[in-house]
From Swiss-Prot:
Function summary: Catalyzes a cyclopropane ring-opening reaction, the irreversible conversion of 1-aminocyclopropane-1-carboxylate (ACC) to ammonia and alpha-ketobutyrate. Allows growth on ACC as a nitrogen source.
Homology family: Belongs to the ACC deaminase/D-cysteine desulfhydrase family.
Gene: acdS
InterPro entries: ACCD_DCysDesulf (IPR027278), ACP_carboxylate_deaminase (IPR005965), ACP_carboxylate_deaminase_bac (IPR020601), TrpB-like_PALP (IPR001926), TrpB-like_PALP_sf (IPR036052)
UniProt superkingdom: Bacteria
Protein's name according to its UniProt entry: 1-aminocyclopropane-1-carboxylate deaminase
Organism: Pseudomonas savastanoi pv. phaseolicola (strain 1448A / Race 6)
Main enzyme class: hydrolase
Length: 338
């Protein structure tokens, strides 16, 4: 596997830390050891997160190509767009963000707090759009790029989740390399890795990275899209492309994509009672915050699997905490009583 041939612009502090979730493990019976790899604190750029890791492999193209404006898209409380705004500010570039109405959630402050607030503070041109949630290339994003060109700028396109970019999966191939180095220091290997999966490139890159040591099917994606067939197809496509790019040496097949669809309901961006319980439980036992859109659902999935005995006794499970905590502010009504 060859990742070193790709240019990388450092945006993170270095390897994100792996920390034990001792109290949560004990609360769930102590038969499974839970750990978290903290992508939620991987960078000093506006709270960082998984997209910051991905952007390290996209940014060199933007710099080398003389682009002056980063153009991206997400929901109103998109973590992606906040991280793109931060990177644009860091590089001295302009930033245009399309924020679509991906979540059927009504709150008076939803479009004024959290991620979107930070993007505005960092100087991004934020454009609200009424289109609902879906996976793939969006007309509103294409129009934003045309607008930049018409005004004399040179737009660099960054798709939702970085996932449609050919290099979107590379950052999480590197994540797997980091884990292997950290496992040497820890003195053991993780039996399973749990990760939230929506637009696909985080899961796909991780799958390819762990396929290098035979653990592709030990990467358990927790669907939060509520459009699992689209997510599954996207993960497979991105993983197959990424495997070729890094010269993995074997083909990625549909059997390599493990996607648990039990926890995404009722729909994208809306938490269920299990999501909220998982958010509170992890916060109160570990002081680790997760959000209602992504990490709360993957945390719910991991907790539920431990409770159900789905991990063999003695398993060491790594939870990939991808970030997303700023979105909590947009869901304050749900937590008005804690």
């Amino acid at each position: 596997m060859n990742l070193s041939k790709f240019k990388r612009y450092p945006l993170t502090f270095g390897p994100s830390p792996i920390t034990p979730l001792k109290r949560l493990s004990e609360h769930l019976g102590g038969k499974v050891e839970l750990y978290a790899k903290r992508e939620d604190c991987n960078s000093g750029l506006a709270f960082g997160g998984n997209k910051t890791r991905k952007l390290e492999y996209l940014v060199p193209e933007a710099i080398d190509g003389g682009y002056d404006t980063l153009v991206s898209i997400g929901g109103i409380q998109s973590n992606q767009t906040r991280q793109v705004a931060a990177v644009a500010a860091h590089l001295g570039m302009k930033c245009v963000l399309v924020q679509e109405n991906w979540v059927n959630y009504s709150d008076a402050l939803y479009d004024r707090v959290g991620n979107i607030e930070m993007s505005r503070i960092m100087g991004a041109d934020v454009r609200l759009d009424s289109a609902g949630f879906d996976i793939g290339i969006r007309p509103s994003w294409e129009k934003a790029m045309s607008d930049v060109e018409e005004s004399g700028g040179k737009p660099f396109p960054i798709p939702a989740g970085c996932s449609e970019h050919p290099y979107g999966g590379l950052g999480f191939v590197r994540f797997a390399d980091e884990v292997r180095q950290q496992e040497e220091e820890l003195g053991f290997k993780f039996d399973y890795i749990v990760v939230c999966s929506v637009t696909g490139s985080t899961h796909a890159g991780m799958l390819v990275g762990f396929a290098a040591d035979g653990r592709a099917q030990r990467v358990i994606g927790i669907d939060a899209s509520a459009k699992p067939e689209k997510t599954r197809a996207q993960v497979l496509r991105i993983a197959q492309n990424t495997a070729k790019l890094v010269e993995l040496g074997r083909e990625i097949t549909a059997e390599d994509v493990v996607l648990d669809t039990r926890y995404a309901y009722p729909e994208y961006g809306l938490p269920n009672e299990g999501t909220l319980e998982a958010i509170r439980l992890c916060a109160r036992l570990e002081g680790v915050l997760t959000d209602p859109v992504y990490e709360g659902k993957s945390m719910h999935g991991m907790i539920d699997m431990v409770r159900n005995g789905e991990f063999p006794e003695g398993s060491k499970v790594l939870y990939a905490h991808l970030g997303g905590v700023p979105a909590l502010n947009a869901y304050s009504f749900l937590f008005k009583d804690g």
